[in-house]
């Protein structure tokens, strides 16, 4: 039963880290990356479809993405979806493909993006700590119910704390890498 707490807490913390990584990947750094367009959905035959399902996004060069479109009839829909996204991108039709130049970032925009990422990191840390709190509450309830001993309670809480510390370090590492990436340009 304590193992179940470890497993569930670990799974929840992994989901939190994955969600934070996705948020960080969606922040534009001025360098071309196909992940930048992962949040774009295209209105295609009456339903919203992820861009990556109807096209292939590749890095053309350091500051340019190239979208190879599977169905030529969706070209204008894809261009419209990119223009309507909050990414400040201006796609250009180039034959059957779409070229997306990635503009450089201003100092003001970099500072703003760093604040946003730091805020997201803090929210992820809070979520991790809440998972720890819930796990510790369950462990304390087991102690009150005399299901486990005090020694087992302390060992379990230490293990949960170690897990929490590891995941918070992962958040900090992702944050520092993205900050460096933003300040590089």
UniProtKB/Swiss-Prot annotation:
**Subcellular locations according to the entry:** Cytoplasm
- List keywords of the entry alphabetically: Cytoplasm, Protein biosynthesis
Q: Which Pfam families match?
A: RRF (PF01765)
Gene Ontology terms describing biological process: cytoplasmic translational termination
Q: Name one GO cellular component term.
A: cytosol
GO MF term set: ribosomal large subunit binding
Task: Provide the primary localization.
Answer: cytoplasm
For this protein, the record's Gene3D superfamilies field holds: 3.30.1360.40, Ribosome-recycling factor
CDD domains in the record, alphabetically?
RRF
Tell me its family: Belongs to the RRF family.
Its job = Responsible for the release of ribosomes from messenger RNA at the termination of protein biosynthesis. May increase the efficiency of translation by recycling ribosomes from one round of translation to another.
Query: What's the protein name?
Result: Ribosome-recycling factor
């Amino acid at each position: 039963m304590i193992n179940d707490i470890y497993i569930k807490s670990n799974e929840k913390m992994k989901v939190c880290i994955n969600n934070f990584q996705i948020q960080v990947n969606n922040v534009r750094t001025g360098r071309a990356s196909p992940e930048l367009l992962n949040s774009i959905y295209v209105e295609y035959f009456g339903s919203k479809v992820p861009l990556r399902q109807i096209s292939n996004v590749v890095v053309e060069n350091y500051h340019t993405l190239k979208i190879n479109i599977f169905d030529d009839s969706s070209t204008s829909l894809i261009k419209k979806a990119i223009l309507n996204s909050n990414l400040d991108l201006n796609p250009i039709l180039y034959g059957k493909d779409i070229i997306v130049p990635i503009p450089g970032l201003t100092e003001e925009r970099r500072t703003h993006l760093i604040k946003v990422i730091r805020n997201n990191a803090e929210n992820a840390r809070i979520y991790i700590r809440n998972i720890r709190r819930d796990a510790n509450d369950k462990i304390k309830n087991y102690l009150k119910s005399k299901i486990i001993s005090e020694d087992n309670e302390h060992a379990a809480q230490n293990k949960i704390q170690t897990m929490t510390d590891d995941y918070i370090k992962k958040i900090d590492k992702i944050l520092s890498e993205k900050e460096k990436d933003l300040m590089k340009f």
